[in-house]
Structures are given as C-alpha cells and as structure tokens.
UniProtKB/Swiss-Prot annotation:
One of its GO terms (molecular function) is L-cysteine desulfhydrase activity. HAMAP family: UPF0597. This is UPF0597 protein HRM2_02820. It comes from the Bacteria. One of its GO terms (biological process) is L-cysteine catabolic process to pyruvate. Belongs to the UPF0597 family. Coiled coil: none annotated. It comes from Desulforapulum autotrophicum (strain ATCC 43914 / DSM 3382 / VKM B-1955 / HRM2).
Length: 442
C-alpha cells in the first residue's frame, strides 16, 4: 500500500497538551477508568512503564498542575478526571479541584508506578481497583495506541478508544513506518505537490498553535528561560538578530513554555510535541526572514513533517538519541533548504549535515532543559541548510555518513536502536539514583 502526504499528516501530526509521556500515562489511566461504574471511588492505581517512557516522563511539568510533575500524579489525574476520547489532549478537562484530589491519592500512596526495565518499545500498562471492580488498559508502540481494555479480567472487544486498523490487524502507523523506511528523499519532496487546501489549513493551524507557545514562553519567562535569555542577549548587542537567532528564540521559547506545563497544546510531529516545535518553528522563522508566502511556508512545514516521520521510522519512537535534534531537526533542515530554493541533492546534503552534526546528542528525559537542545537543533537546522546551499556537505568517508541521505538516516537508526542500548540504561540509572537520593534526603 502506498501512502499520501494526507495520510502522513493524519497519522503523525496532531495536537498534544503537555509532554507526551505523562500524557500517555494519563491516557492509559483515563481509558481504564471509563470501564468503572460512575462515582466508584478509586482505591489503587498501578502503572507499569517501559524504560524510555519512564525516563521521559519523570521530571517534566504536567499542564494545569501549576508546575507539578510526577508519573504517579499523571496517572491519578487521568484516572480521576481525564477524557480518554481526547487522546493526547486527555488532560484538557482538569481543574484545580481534580489536581487536589489526585495529589491526595498520591500522598495516600494509592498510586504505584513500576519500571519494566527489560522491556523494549513503548508500553503503558495500567490497573485501577475500585471496590469489586478492576479495570485495566494497555498502550503499546505509540503514545495514544490503546490496544487492550479489560474489566474484571474480561477483554473488552469493541470500543471507539481502540485505533482503526488495516487488513491483517496491523496498526496504521506501524504500517506507515514500514512503508516510510523504503521511500526516497525525492519521493518525500514530491509529496508536497499533493497538498490541498484543507491540508494547508491544517498545517497553518499547527504553525499558529506552536507560535502561541513561543509567545507564551517569551511573554511569561517560564521554564529554563532559554528563549527570553536569547532575546535579552540580542537586546544587549551580544548576539546578532538574524534568521538563525529568530529560529532559536521561537523554538526555545516554545520549549520553555511547553516543558513548564503551559496550558496550551502543541502541534506534534511523529508522536512528540517537542518534535512539532522543532519541525515547525525554525521553518517559520526562515520563511519570515525570506518573506515567503503562506502557501510556501505551509508546503515547507508539510515536508518537515514527512522527513521527521521518515527519520523516526528508523530511530524508533523513544530511544537514547535526542530525536528532536536528529529527526525533527532533519525535517526542519529539509524544509528550510527547500524554502531557500534547494534541489533534491542539496536538501539531502543538508539533512546529512545536521545528522552528522547532532547524531550523538542524548535524550536524558523530558524536562525544562530540553529548551537548550531545541535551541541547538533550530540553529543547526538553519546552518545545515545554508551550508548545503553554499556547496558544503559532509562526505561518505565521514563516520556514519552514507552514500545518500537515506543511507545516512538508516545508519543513524542502527546507531540508535543497536548501539545506544547501554547508553539508555546508563542514563536511566543516573536519573533513578538521583531520584532515590533526593527521596532519602527528605
């Protein structure tokens, strides 16, 4: 089966409120809670997580909680007041009263989160006990892919919470990723010619959504404050106000806002809100600098989403490698090079530039300092494009660089999925040791 760019946008690009890892935990709990009798008091919540989801959700702020974080809090919020039908916007209905109730569950040690340290691949398994009822849910492979619901041990066969599937029962996104791994850069570039009016409107909505986060970050000085600091440095004349600076400011400020738990959705890309910020905002900054028209901006962002999905199909959904840098960064690079008038060869060369530059950036979980990495990715995306447009591209003799952009991306996928397994374990161990030490000091 061949896919269109409309299919890719439908499956890979969607609004997400808050970091996608605690949101996935909340979604799993909310889905299980739909099986309980209304008004039934929750006694216990148990959640089992894969290592990468555990790592990514450990320290990031949860929307509508006034800056609070915690895997257990995310589960409690989802179970008590989340709307599972909203998928990655599951926490939209949360109120201060719900937060207080969730905190009470956590304080009463009624929520247990366990690490499945040997599991590979995304997994959220949730069990909620309420009186004589036990409700269970499973999310696998993708953050919103609910694959199982059980009540008192009996499998629920039909529900609108289950994803639609293709023939043979294969999940649509899994099938798409398999297809993506076999296409070329030329195919991806050609896809944007098929964007219709509704696609362009959807892409513009994503641009507007992520720009709102950037404005929130700049106006409220939230999170680590990377965006506001970059802006202050420019005001002092210490750094230049060019399109690289603008790309950095917009992307970092949006990350500041999102990682601090701002109550605003991000338009995600390939399953991640931060990917969406990186895939969209540097492109917007360059388009503004070039005075590109709205249609070209939206077409470029469409290309960015496709390339981001292509890279993620090789690296996997969650890994030790920072995919904001190499996947969404590659998407933004391709889009920027296209806006600059680049040929398919120059676009591929630019993508290879950024991958060779940032392939070693690790993911040490979602948290405020992600803004630093998104700042770097935005800057390098513009630089990689400008380098390629001026004849500078890395060579096949260099490290993991292959004979084409596609081969280089495949090599990076091998690095991510095979070469960084122990790195991932070490990162998580350091984070867990910190958590244990901080608790022992309290």
């Amino acid at each position: 089966m061949n896919y269109t760019i409309k299919d890719i946008l439908k499956l890979e690009v969607a609004p997400a409120l808050g970091c996608t890892e605690p949101t996935a935990i909340a979604l799993g709990a909310a889905a299980a809670a739909t099986l309980l009798f209304p008004g039934k008091a929750i006694e216990t919540i148990e959640v089992w997580l894969d290592p990468n989801l555990f790592k990514n959700g450990l320290a990031v702020s949860i929307p509508r909680t006034h800056g609070r974080s915690g895997l257990d809090l995310a589960a409690a919020l989802g179970a008590l007041a989340g709307d599972a039908h909203l998928k990655m916007e599951v926490l939209t209905p949360i109120t201060d009263k719900d937060v207080d109730a969730a905190l009470a569950l956590v304080a009463g040690k009624q929520v247990k989160v366990r690490l499945l340290d040997r599991h590979r691949g995304l997994l959220v398994r949730t069990r909620i006990k309420a009186g004589d009822q036990i409700a269970e849910s499973v999310i696998e492979q993708l953050h919103d892919n609910i694959t199982s619901l059980c009540l008192n041990g009996e499998q629920i066969e039909t529900t609108d919470l289950f994803p639609r599937s293709l023939e043979g029962g294969k999940n649509q996104t899994s099938a798409l990723e398999l297809w993506l791994r076999g296409i070329t850069m030329e195919t991806m570039i050609a896809m944007i010619d098929d964007l219709d009016g509704s696609d362009l409107e959807f892409l513009q909505t994503g641009i507007d959504m992520n720009m709102a986060l950037a404005r929130h970050g700049l106006e409220n000085a939230v999170g680590l404050g990377v965006g506001t600091t970059l802006e202050a440095l420019a005001q002092k004349g210490l750094v230049a106000r060019d399109m690289i600076h603008r790309a950095r400011v917009l992307t970092a400020a949006a990350a500041d806002a999102r990682m601090s738990g701002a109550p605003l959705p991000a338009m995600s890309s390939a399953g991640s809100g931060n990917h969406g910020l990186t895939a969209i905002l540097p492109v917007k900054a360059v388009a503004d600098h070039l005075k590109s028209d709205r249609k070209d901006l939206c077409r470029a962002v469409g290309l960015s989403h496709v390339v981001t999905a292509f890279v993620k199909a090789h690296t996997g959904r969650l890994a030790a490698i920072c995919a904001c840098s190499v996947a969404a960064g590659a998407g933004a690079t391709a889009a920027i090079t296209w806006l600059l008038g680049g040929t398919p060869g120059q676009i591929g060369g630019a993508v290879e530039n950024i991958i060779e530059d940032l392939a070693g950036v690790i993911c040490d979980g979602a948290k405020n300092s992600c803004a630093l990495k998104l700042d770097t990715a935005a800057a390098r995306a513009v630089q990689a494009a400008l380098f390629a447009m001026n004849g500078l591209t890395v060579k096949v003799t260099d490290g993991i660089v292959g004979g084409s952009a596609e081969e280089t991306i495949r090599n990076m996928g091998i690095l991510s999925s095979q070469g960084m397994i122990e790195t991932d374990k070490t990162i998580l161990k350091i984070m867990m040791d910190k958590l244990i030490n901080s608790r022992s000091e309290q």
